[in-house]
Curated annotation (Swiss-Prot):
Catalytic site: 252, 300
Principal EC category: hydrolase
Annotated stretches, region: Disordered: 88-131
Entry's family note: Belongs to the peptidase C14A family.
GO cellular component, one term: AIM2 inflammasome complex
UniProt source species: Macaca mulatta (Rhesus macaque)
Name of the protein this chain belongs to: Caspase-12
Length: 421
């Protein structure tokens, strides 16, 4: 090998010469120890010579393209700073209307709103670092950790027999036609788009399918379109040979309803909770009579933070305003009495009047927790216990906080999912 010193002005040539010196020494050792014969060494040398000789062309090519890459990255970062933020957004229907009001306000009001916006950003950023380690919030949206734990058939048979009077009947897998409906709205005419909600959709679809449900998906609907979709779903004949159903709603929201895609303050577009319950009650959906009807809602219910500060250790618990007794009525056949609203459970992402948080990059915290706890415990725990575990994961308030609530619970038995059976 030539002993020529590499030029300091040509780093590529320097690397070439150093590489040749090192390889020559290695090849000599391989020949001396009979690891390679002359022909093998010649073929290997041809390939290495090609790589070394073309290294200069590669560096020139990279150098030329690096300038273009740098310009693209610079433009992207400066024109789309929001894509790099790791902020949580709440699902309140007030967001966009507040922005439209700001455009017509005085400069002083605009400055105040800017300060409030910065405070929210700081709080959201702090929340991402304030999540307690016991809450598995890294398990987000469509990428939950682990698989659904299946219930051993022997355990399923034993519990089904021993607690037959306490649990809802579970149909055999063969011939069973479970259905679930997911309504997810991401794009809105006047409200902010719900970026990250597609991960919630994929995660819930995967969970429900693994639990044995055929999932019907509806996206970006107005309130009227949502009502139509619900009535069509309630009329599906598959419910007759099913033992339960899930209804999942993901959108912006108000206190007692889900916002449609055309909602704004001047012209509300809201599907009210009462409408959902009315469509699936025993009067209007007899195919699901005496069968669990699980409603899950990811949406804000106001703009409150949902926290209170105490100066002492004492404090009064707030009253639950949704635990009202439901009246019973006579069904149309006038032969057998049945409660109009029965076998429902609604699990909402926040308490009344308060916000619910969603991460643009990983979806909503509420949905991710549901997915995690269902996968971990649905093989052995009934539904209310699983929901309670989700609630406990939110028990300690963080910088931004929410507390899921169980409402309009009219189940008279325990609902076990027995995944795998």
């Amino acid at each position: 090998m030539a002993d020529k010193k590499p030029s300091k002005e040509d780093p590529v040539n320097m690397v070439k010469l150093l590489t040749r010196n090192v390889l020559d020494g290695i090849f000599d050792d391989l020949m001396e120890n009979n690891v390679l014969n002359t022909e093998e060494l010649r073929n290997l040398g041809k390939g290495l010579n090609f790589m070394v000789n073309n290294a200069g062309n590669l560096v020139d090519n990279i150098t030329e393209k690096a300038q273009m890459v740098g310009k693209i990255l610079k433009d992207r970062l400066l024109s789309h700073p929001k894509q790099l933020s790791l902020e949580y957004q709440h699902e309140s229907e007030d967001q966009e209307s507040e922005e439209s009001s700001a455009s017509s306000s005085s400069s002083t009001e605009s400055e105040e709103e800017n300060e409030e916006s910065k405070d929210e950003e700081r709080a959201a950023s702090a929340h991402s670092m304030a999540v307690p380690p016991t809450a598995p919030l890294e398990i987000q949206g469509a990428q939950p950790s682990g698989r659904l734990k299946l219930c051993p058939h022997a355990h399923f048979r034993e519990l089904k027999t021993k607690r037959a009077d306490e649990i809802y009947p579970v149909m055999e897998k063969e011939g069973r036609t479970r259905l679930a409906l997911i309504i997810c709205s991401k794009e809105f005419h006047y409200l902010l788009n719900r970026n990250g909600s597609e991960l919630d959709l994929l995660g819930m679809q995967d969970l429900l399918e693994n639990l044995g449900y055929s999932v019907v998906i509806e996206e970006n609907l107005t309130a009227q379109e949502m009502e139509t979709a619900l009535r069509q779903f309630a009329a599906r004949p598959e419910h007759q040979s099913s033992d339960s159903t899930f209804l999942v709603f993901m959108s912006h929201g108000i206190l007692n309803g889900i916002c449609g895609t055309k909602h704004w303050d001047q012209e509300p577009d809201v599907l009210h909770d009462d409408t959902i319950f009315e469509i699936f009650n025993n009067r209007n959906c007899r195919s699901l009579r005496d069968k669990p009807k699980v409603i899950i809602m990811q949406a804000c219910r106001g703009s409150g933070a949902g926290i209170v500060w105490f100066t002492t250790d004492s404090g009064k618990a707030s009253a639950d305003t949704h635990g009202q007794l439901l009246q019973s009525s006579i069904c149309n056949d006038a032969v057998t009495k049945a409660h109009v609203e029965k076998d429902f459970i609604a699990f909402k992402s926040s308490t009344p009047h308060n916000v619910s948080w969603r991460h643009e990059m990983s979806g909503s915290v509420f949905i991710s927790q549901i997915i995690y706890y269902f996968k971990e415990y649905s093989w052995s725990h009934h539904l209310e216990e699983i929901f309670r575990k989700v609630q406990r994961s939110f028990e300690t308030p963080n910088v931004v906080t929410q507390l899921p609530t169980i409402e309009r619970l009219s189940m008279t038995r325990y609902f076990y999912l027995f995944p795998g059976n």
